[in-house]
């Protein structure tokens, strides 16, 4: 195997291991208790939209990092979709706790936060939930404290989701449950399947999707052999860049893309022209590979976070020049 093939093999292997453990959502969750070095008591109050009080449970361990995104209103607040719930990570204070009660701690696969700070996700019902599997498209308007099921309930399991930054009425999702790609033009209320010609026979090689804030019908897809482009809302894809691919991608303000690259560029890369050109940004720690998720803070684009196949999370406050390990092998550092 050449270097690119070896990297792709490692990434495929990591994805396979994670997906094998994320199919039913019926396993017992790990214990959640207060971390010994964090000022976070079991009696801490977490207000929700109805001003009810919930008990914050500090994170002792996470398993299977699937996706992550930063809060749109408050700087330095990272949310991480995992096998056993949505983790709230405050990079300012070092506090890590689970969002919501046990019945709302699902196996969050695809996860995003829209420009309006609406949380959306998909996946499998968690321990204690009576919901059907898969969950379809879920929404939360209280930072993931509570979730409501909606479109495609019990029909799809979106492992990849994207909300257009220019028009969040436009959303895209890849359903790993049925091997299909969908599009919504009304904020996720209604969805239609798109044909995805050009990549639909290789969905097992699809890593990432992102749409252009200046043209919501333009979509980039990171595939094993390069980046593909659709100009018609996901109906047809053509090879756009065969020199590199993006195994995970996040969009910052003004359409800036940050991605984990494999190929001509290895590691963190940035594009200011929506994928036309890419440049190296900083340097990822060697032990961070393979990277499964990446997020940029819209409140401060110097702040980045990555999640790895080893259930580790790193964050940077200087756009990738230096990194701090905050979760190591599933345990808050």
Question: Which ranges hold each PLM region?
Answer:
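C-terminal motif of bacterial Sec signal peptides marking the signal peptidase cleavage site
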Residues: 18-21
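Asp-box/BNR beta-propeller loop motif
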Residues: 84-105, 133-151, 178-199, 228-241, ...
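Hydrophobic beta-strand positions that form the internal "hydrophobic ladder"
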Residues: 78, 118-119, 171, 219, ...
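Repeated scaffold domains used in trafficking and secretory/extracellular systems
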Residues: 65-69, 106-112, 156-163, 203-210, ...
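Bacterial signal peptide processing site
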Residues: 23-25
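Short, solvent-exposed loop/turn segments at conserved positions within beta-propeller repeat blades
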Residues: 128-134, 174-178, 202, 222, ...
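Residue-level detector of Asp-centered blade-edge/turn motifs that repeat once per structural unit
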Residues: 70-75, 113-116, 163-168, 213-215, ...
